[in-house]
UniProtKB/Swiss-Prot annotation:
The gene is atpF2. One of its GO terms (cellular component) is proton-transporting ATP synthase complex. The chain crosses the membrane at residues 26-45. This is ATP synthase subunit b'. F-type ATPases have 2 components, F(1) - the catalytic core - and F(0) - the membrane proton channel. F(1) has five subunits: alpha(3), beta(3), gamma(1), delta(1), epsilon(1). F(0) has four main subunits: a(1), b(1), b'(1) and c(10-14). The alpha and beta chains form an alternating ring which encloses part of the gamma chain. F(1) is attached to F(0) by a central stalk formed by the gamma and epsilon chains, while a peripheral stalk is formed by the delta, b and b' chains. It comes from the Bacteria. Pfam families: ATP-synt_B. Belongs to the ATPase B chain family. Coiled coil: none annotated. The keyword Nucleotide-binding does not apply. GO terms for molecular function: proton-transporting ATP synthase activity, rotational mechanism; proton-transporting ATPase activity, rotational mechanism. Keywords: ATP synthesis, CF(0), Hydrogen ion transport, Ion transport, Membrane, Thylakoid, Transmembrane, Transmembrane helix, Transport. It is a single-pass membrane protein. It comes from Trichodesmium erythraeum (strain IMS101). It is found in: Cellular thylakoid membrane.
Length: 161
């Protein structure tokens, strides 16, 4: 009896139309599905795929270019840093040389100035010595003259000569 109920239930379902009715609509639905898939492929999926592929290629190319630019920028930065270090070393050498030259020039000028000062000091000492001798000679003359005057006053003018 249970078997009979199942058979009757299946027959009723088959008569009313079930999930898969095998009739002319099934191949029509399959053809519609294939046609829709074909149209979507031509109109939507291929252009979308091409757009996605071209965008991916564009991004990939830009990434490669960016990596190249970054590598070039790093290389240039390293090169500039090396050149800057070399320039700094050269400038330090030039500064040291200039300082040495300036010290040499200053030492030479100081030596020349000291020699000039020594010469002027010696000239001044000679001048002072000459003036001293002249003053002493004048004083001797004055002393001689004053001594005679004193003697003349004390002894009289007749005895002094």
């Amino acid at each position: 009896m249970i078997n009979l109920t199942i058979v009757l239930a299946v027959e009723e379902v088959a008569e009313k139309g079930g999930l898969f009715d095998i009739n002319a609509t099934l191949p029509l639905m399959a053809i519609q599905f294939l046609l829709l898939a074909f149209v979507l492929d031509k109109i939507f999926y291929k252009p979308l795929g091409k757009a996605i592929d071209s965008r991916a290629d564009y991004i990939r190319e830009n990434q490669v270019k960016a990596k190249e630019r970054l590598a070039k920028a790093k290389q240039l930065a390293e090169q500039y840093e090396q050149e800057f270090a070399q320039t700094r070393q050269k400038s330090q050498v030039v500064i040291v040389a200039a300082q040495a030259e300036a010290e040499k020039i200053a030492a030479t000028k100081v030596a020349v100035a000291q020699k000039e000062a020594q010469v002027k000091r010696e000239q001044a000492a000679q001048e002072i010595e000459k003036q001293k001798e002249v003053a002493l000679e004048q004083l001797e003359e004055q002393v001689d003259s004053l001594s005679r005057q004193i003697l003349e006053k004390l002894l009289g003018p007749e005895l002094v000569r």
